[in-house]
Amino acid sequence: SALDRLNARTDELIDQLGLGTYRDHRAADLSYGRKRVLEIATTLALDPQVLLLDEPMAGMGREDVAMVAGIIRNVATERAVLMVEHNLSVVADICDHVTVLQRGEILARGDYATVSADPRVRTAYMGNDA
């Protein structure tokens, strides 16, 4: 039945995203990082071809950032991921292609090494001394 398929998909995502320990917890009782993982899981339950993420690392501590970055990296093997993110170490670690915007205009695009070396990007996002 449809409910059986939904329950099976839910169990698969819970295990895939490392939420098994929290299976019987209320979402409100989860840590901030685990709540973000749950948000990703609810989106993945719909099996999208493209996963859109807006600042997925915002407000997270280093440990949660590493956990969520790993999940996004794994998810990206099965679908396209479009992510807005200001944590440059995460961008460097996860992204194959980077587009930098400034005031709605494309400032630079390419792989992280190319984009991060662009003087306009360095001035705009990393400061003049970067």
Predicted regions and their residues:
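Glycine-rich phosphate-binding loops of nucleotide-dependent enzymes
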Residues: 1-130
